[in-house]
Each structure stands twice: as structure tokens, then as C-alpha cells.
Amino acid sequence: MGPLTFMDVAIEFSLEEWQCLDTAQQNLYRNVMLENYRNLVFLGIAVSNLDLITCLEQGKEPWNMKRHEMAAKPPAMCSHFAKDLRPEQYIKNSFQQVILRRYGKCGYQKGCKSVDEHKLHKGGHKGLNRCVTTTQSKIVQCDKYVKVFHKYSNAKRHKIRHTGKNPFKCKECGKSFCMLSQLTQHEIIHTGEKPYKCEECGKAFKKSSNLTNHKIIHTGEKPYKCEECGKAFNQSSTLTRHKIIHTGEKLYKCEECGKAFNRSSNLTKHKIVHTGEKPYKCEECGKAFKQSSNLTNHKKIHTGEKPYKCGECGKAFTLSSHLTTHKRIHTGEKPYKCEECGKAFSVFSTLTKHKIIHTEEKPYKCEECGKAFNRSSHLTNHKVIHTGEKPYKCEECGKAFTKSSTLTYHKVIHTGKKPYKCEECGKAFSIFSILTKHKVIHTEDKPYKCEECGKTFNYSSNFTNHKKIHTGEKPYKCEECGKSFILSSHLTTHKIIHTGEKPYKCKECGKAFNQSSTLMKHKIIHTGEKPYKCEECGKAFNQSPNLTKHKRIHTKEKPYKCK
């Protein structure tokens, strides 16, 4: 079989057949013809009949004559094979169904005022039927060529993905794409247009598919179920992605560092780590992001929008994923389990972070001082040490922070709210993560053991900090006096000595402190609370260090030796 040409997939129409179509259908013909011409050029197929294309671009008839003239003329070309953008069935609908539906039952006998008019109309109608029948047969004959064209062009487009060529470039930001449809979707980012609106809540979307997916939030329907673990999803694509958790398959590998991913989208996101590119900028505050989704989520900080509400406790969230994660607090569900040590997590990303403990891999390196980290977020936080930047400021007291999350935690000090309560002892906390850490006191689970001295820890962060005692590493240095510290938090606390700042004030007696933890300990004096009880003799203490010291009376332990 020879190479595919324009003539292989063309349909010929006579003038009589052309006149069967109304103005709208003729315009449709022109649009499809020009669109397919562009597709052929893109696929590298030569089109010889350029006079016809020029004629169509100028909005003229496919031949130079008036429509009412009935003399026989050379046939016109029609390429209603509509590759990709119009599948085969559309061809049949365009002529076979649309024309027949429009003229098949025109009732010409009823509308005629005279016998002559009736005969004339009847003759015209028969001619139309002949025209439609001819058109139908030509469409059926063309089907096999359509399939050949589809197969050829799909293969051609598929090959482009492997070559890495991106011929379609955005004029706004310069980003390139391998397909025209991808460029079209991307351009909406710059226009901000959201034509698809949800009738239920009024939320608008850039794509109709996003609106369709969003509607399921209101119905709560989850028709796609995982056969492995029984978890249900509202989208088939989400189920497909979920299944990879069970198989552990990672097909997509980074050529830069060799790291592998189970999704191509994750690989694309990862690549930005190496380039450092942040093309999505917030117009409100100027902050830039690597992904458009992160920018969308960030914008909600400025608007204060929290559309996702927990039915259990009423807490609202900016993202549906945050609500899903939050619900596990109430259910206690921990579906993500570490195969290495058996520890389970409520969030998949936490499991991913946890796994690094076992590998001790640190792929994220600071260019300033050479220090390496196992998470990109830790590297980002570390970089602030060199810049000294604190962009997140508390409106209540003016204190500034390097991270937005730290500011969020800090704000709770001013509100005094403690929504997270320990079921074991009744103690309440302002932050959920602190409650999680507190619970370890009751379980005494300490999975992290130091190989150097045998000491065990209940948190990986405490274990990491402890290791520095043996290495003697003190990377955080005070510019004022030169003193170095193991932890950045210790340096922050130390700096207050030079400034004399005491931002944490007791509402009960007015006494001020330079650390929030010291204020918390101080408050116990007023309440008389002694939550730390010795299991050996029953004596209670208001601080955990005091209990630790007391226990040595029973154990006779003397850890401090004179050198």
C-alpha cells in the first residue's frame, strides 16, 4: 500500500449534491475542509488542490458559478473525514442523518397551492432524494479511508511524544506543547476564562471535564471501587492512579537524577526541582509557584474561601483533599502502611516522607552551604537561614515568620483555642500535630533507635536532632556573638537574649516570656494541673522533665559522669 494522499480520503460532490445543503451546512463544509487541511499539513501530507483551499478561505463557492445555475460542472472536493476532532460517526451525522431529518418528511404535498406547483415541488424533492442517496453511498465508501487516516495520524501524533518535539508554542509565556489541543487548554491560564459554571454552587471551571468531575462532590457518588482494598473513587482515573499504590510500579524515571515515579504528571512536577522554574505568579502578593494548581490553592488565602466543610465538627477547608484527610481524624483510618516497619499513616505523602528514614536518601542539596535534605520542603525552609527572609507577619503582634504554617500555629496563641483533645488524659492542644506527638507519652512507642548510644525516640525529627550530638555538627551560627547551635529553633531562641524581646505574655499575671513553651509551662502554676504522673509511686508533676528526673530515684540511674 502506497503512502496516504489527500485524494485517498477525499469525497467528490457534484453541483446538484452541493445544492442539497443549506447555508449552515455549506459553512460547516468550509470550516471542516480548512481544519482538515491544517491537520494534513501538520502530519506532513502534501495537498495539491491549493486553489480550492484559497477559495474556501475567502468564503467563496467551491467553483466559480452561481448556485441556481444547473449546468454540469467539475465536481468539488469534500474532506469530511475530520481527523481527531471529528470521528467517523460525525461524518454520517453531518450528511446522512442531518439532511434526511431536515428534508425526509418535508410534507411537500400539503403546502402546494396549485397542481403545477405540486409537480415542481415533487420533482425537486425526488432530485433531493437522489442527491442524498448518492451522498450516503459516497460516505460509506469513504469509511475505510477514514480509518486508514485515523490510524496513520494517531501513530504520527503518538510518535511525536517520544521524539520530545513541541511544535506548538504559547505566545504569552513561551511554553511549548506537542499537541495543538494542549496549547489551546493552556492558553486559558493566561485569559482566566472559566466558561463552565456549576448550577449547584456557582463555581466556574476552565474545562467542561473539570465541571463534570466537580458535580460528583454534590452527589457524593463513588462508583469506581478498588478490588484490592475496597476503597471507592468518584473518577475512574483516580482509581487507576490508586491501583499503582498496590503494585508499586514506577514507570516514569527522571533522566537528571534517576528518581522514578508512578505517574507522568509527578515526573513533570519533579523536573521543576532541577530547573527551579516558577511560571505561575500571584497578582495579589507576587509569590510564584511551580504549578498552576498551587497558585489556585494559594489564591484562596487572599479570598478566605473555604468551600469544603466537615459534617462531623463543622471545620471548613480550602481544598477537598484537606477535608478528606481531616475526616480521618474522626474515623482513625490509616490506609497507608510502611512495608519496612509496619507503621501506618492517614496520608500517602506522609508515608512517602517516612520511607526516606529507611533509605536515608538526601537528594535535595543547598547550593549555599552544601547541606543535603531528604525533602524539598526542608531545603526550602533551610534556604531562609541564608536569606533571613520572613515574609509571613502576624497582624496581631507583628511577629514575622519564615513559613506560613508557623504563622498559622502562632495565631492560635492569640485565640487561645484548643480544639484537639487527648482521649486518654483529656489534655487539649491548639495544633493537631502536637496532639499526635503527645499521644506517644501514653503508648511509649519509640521506633527510632540510635546506633551510636542505643537511645530510642518516638519521633524521627528528635532522632535526627539527637544524631548531631555524636557528630558535633552545629550548622546554625549567631551573627551577634558567634555561638553555634544544632537546631535553627535554638538559634532563634538564643537571638532573643540579644534583643531582650519577650513576646509571650501571661494573661493571668502579666508575666512575659521569650518562648511560647515557657509560657505554657508557666500557666500550669495558675491552674495547679499536674498531668505527668509516676507509675511507680503515684507522685504527679506539672512538667514532663520533672517526672523524668524523678523516675531516676526508682531506677538509681546516674547518667552524668565526671570526665
From Swiss-Prot:
Modified residues (Phosphoserine): 544
Lineage per the UniProt record: Eukaryota, Metazoa, Chordata, Craniata, Vertebrata
PANTHER family: ZINC FINGER PROTEIN, ZINC FINGER PROTEIN 493
InterPro entries: KRAB (IPR001909), KRAB_dom_sf (IPR036051), Znf_C2H2_sf (IPR036236), Znf_C2H2_type (IPR013087)
One Pfam match: zf-C2H2
Sequence ranges assigned to domain KRAB in this UniProt record: 4-75
Similarity field: Belongs to the krueppel C2H2-type zinc-finger protein family.
Protein name: Zinc finger protein 708
One cellular-component annotation, GO: nucleus
Annotated source species: Homo sapiens
Designated gene of the protein: ZNF708
Subcellular location: Nucleus
GO molecular function terms noted in the UniProt entry: DNA binding; zinc ion binding
CDD domains in UniProt: KRAB_A-box
